Amino acid sequence: MRIGNLFYEEKENGTFDIGFIEENVKVFNHQTYKLTCHLDKKNYQKFKKKIGSLDNIIKLFSDRFHVNEFNKFCNKHEIKYTHKVRIGD
């Protein structure tokens, strides 16, 4: 699902991706910048339990995906994730 710059996806294997996409970024020669945070199955279950509903994602992290708030939330609740950045289309 994508709302504003925020996207998230529940994968069939029980994992979860969340992040943001910024298009036409001047500093990157007008290319797309994409940050993806990946939660494995175990950590996604912890995440879902703590947020209550995926509908709360926007309330907690905004439709622009405030990654610092996401990081604080995950640290507070001992939720581990990996992240990757992609620049370009």
Predicted feature descriptions by range:
Residues M1-I18, V25:
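Short, charged/polar N-terminal "headpieces" of proteins
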Residues G19-I21, H38:
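Residue-level recognition of well-ordered beta-strand positions that form the cores
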